[in-house]
Curated annotation (Swiss-Prot):
Region (Disordered): 1-20, 228-259
Record protein name field: NAP1-related protein 1
Organism: Oryza sativa subsp. japonica
Family the entry assigns: Belongs to the nucleosome assembly protein (NAP) family.
Bias kind Basic and acidic residues: ranges: 1-15
GO cellular component: chromatin; cytoplasm; nucleus
Alphabetical keyword list: Chaperone, Coiled coil, Cytoplasm, Nucleus
Length: 259
C-alpha cells in the first residue's frame, strides 16, 4: 500500500517552481500585522498609564507605611516571625541570622521616582553586637537596554561577627560537608554588578511583591498556629477531665451497690 502511494506522488525536482503565493492572502496578513501593531501600541500606552497611577498611589501609601512601621516596632520579633513563617524566606535564615533579625526594626521598599527605573530594599536594625551599620540597603536599577544594576551596602561586621561567608559544617552521623549560607550572603551577592533584565533576583522580588505589602499575613500564620496548639492542649485537658469524672462516677456507683 505504501509503495502504491509513493508511486502516485510526483517526485519534486530541484527545478520545480514553488506555488505562487495568493496575493489576497498576503494582503490579509499585512492588514493583520497592522492591527497587531496597533494593539501593541495601545498595550504600551495602557502600561504607561498603569505605572503612572501606581506611582501616584505610592505617594499616597508612603505615610501609611510609616505609621505601620511605628506600630510594628512595638511588637517583639515581628519581622523575624514574619520571615520564618514565609514558605520561601523562612528557609533563608540560619540560626545566626535569626539572632541578628531580633534586632531588625523595619523593612522598607521604596520605588524610584520613575517607577520603571528600579527600587530599593532597606533593612533598619537597632544597635547590635554584629555590625556597625543600622541601615542596610540593596538597590536595583533598570536601564533602557533592560540590564539590571545592583548596589548594596557593604556590611561593616564587628570583629569575629562576620557570618556572611558560607560556613562548612557536618551533621552528627553524616560525613558530608554541608554549607550554611547566611541571608546576609544574599544581601551582598551581585552587589555593584550588572546583569540581564531576565535574571531577576527572586528573593528581592518576594520581599517586594509578597512580604512587604502585607507582612501581618505571615506574622499571623505563626500566631494562629500557636493558638491552635493551645486549643488542642485545652481539648486534651478537657477530655482527660471528663475521663476522670467518668471514672469517679463509676467508682461511686460501685460503692453504692456494695452498700
Amino acid at each position: 500500500m505504501a509503495a502504491a502511494e509513493q508511486k502516485g506522488k510526483k517526485p519534486r525536482t530541484d527545478g520545480a517552481e514553488a506555488e505562487p503565493v495568493d496575493a489576497a492572502l498576503l494582503q490579509s496578513i499585512e492588514k493583520l500585522q497592522e492591527i497587531q501593531d496597533e494593539i501593541e501600541k495601545v498595550n504600551e500606552e495602557a502600561c504607561d498609564k498603569v505605572l503612572e497611577l501606581e506611582q501616584k498611589y505610592n505617594e499616597v501609601r508612603r505615610p501609611v507605611y510609616v505609621r505601620r512601621n511605628k506600630i510594628i516596632k512595638q511588637i517583639p520579633d515581628f519581622w523575624l516571625t514574619a520571615f520564618l513563617s514565609h514558605p520561601m524566606l523562612g528557609e533563608l535564615l540560619t540560626e545566626d541570622d535569626q539572632k541578628i533579625f531580633k534586632h531588625l526594626e523595619s523593612i522598607d521598599v521604596d520605588d524610584s521616582e520613575d517607577i520603571k527605573s528600579g527600587y530599593s530594599i532597606t533593612l533598619t536594625f537597632s544597635p547590635n553586637p554584629y555590625f556597625e551599620d543600622t541601615k542596610l540597603t540593596k538597590t536595583y536599577s533598570f536601564s533602557d537596554d533592560e540590564a539590571v544594576k545592583v548596589k548594596a551596602t557593604s556590611i561593616r561586621w564587628k570583629k569575629g561577627m562576620d557570618i556572611a561567608n558560607d560556613r562548612a559544617y557536618t551533621k552528627k552521623g553524616d560525613k558530608r560537608i554541608l554549607i550554611d549560607e547566611s541571608f546576609f550572603t544574599w544581601f551582598n551577592s551581585e552587589k555593584n554588578r550588572s546583569f540581564a533584565h531576565g535574571a531577576m533576583d527572586e528573593v528581592a522580588d518576594v520581599i517586594k511583591e509578597d512580604l512587604w505589602p502585607n507582612p501581618l499575613k505571615y506574622f499571623n500564620n505563626e500566631f494562629e498556629e500557636e493558638l491552635e496548639l493551645l486549643d488542642d492542649d485545652d481539648e486534651v485537658s478537657d477530655d482527660d477531665d471528663e475521663e476522670e469524672d467518668d471514672e469517679d462516677q463509676g467508682e461511686g456507683e460501685e460503692d453504692g451497690e456494695e452498700n
